[in-house]
Amino acid sequence: MFTLKKSLLLLFFLGTINLSLCEQERNADEEERRDDSDKRDVEVEKRFLSTLLNVASKVVPTLFCKITKKC
């Protein structure tokens, strides 16, 4: 009976440690996800600005040509 209690106590202790480690890992993952959304916003902003610059580089010369009528 004593050895059974000892074994159960050991299993309970190891399970508690395991759950604690999983919780810490889960918290770290949540923090990473929060940081990732900021990085994604920056990446989207960079893509948007580069697309806008590409369009502007094609449209501005055409507009300048039509306004000055020196085509």
Curated annotation (Swiss-Prot):
Expressed by the skin glands. Pfam families: Antimicrobial_1, FSAP_sig_propep. One of its GO terms (biological process) is defense response to fungus. Keywords: Amphibian defense peptide, Antibiotic, Antimicrobial, Cleavage on pair of basic residues, Cytolysis, Disulfide bond, Fungicide, Hemolysis, Secreted, Signal. Disulfide bonds join C65-C71. The keyword Signal applies. It comes from the Eukaryota. InterPro entries: Antimicrobial_frog_1 (IPR012520), Frog_antimicrobial_propeptide (IPR004275). Residues 23-45 form a propeptide. The keyword Aminoacyl-tRNA synthetase does not apply. It is found in: Secreted. GO terms for cellular component: extracellular region. Residues 1-22 form the signal peptide. Belongs to the frog skin active peptide (FSAP) family. Brevinin subfamily. Antimicrobial peptide active against a variety of Gram-positive and some Gram-negative bacterial strains. Has antifungal activity against C.albicans ATCC 10231 and a slime mold isolate. Has hemolytic activity against human erythrocytes. This is Brevinin-1CG4.
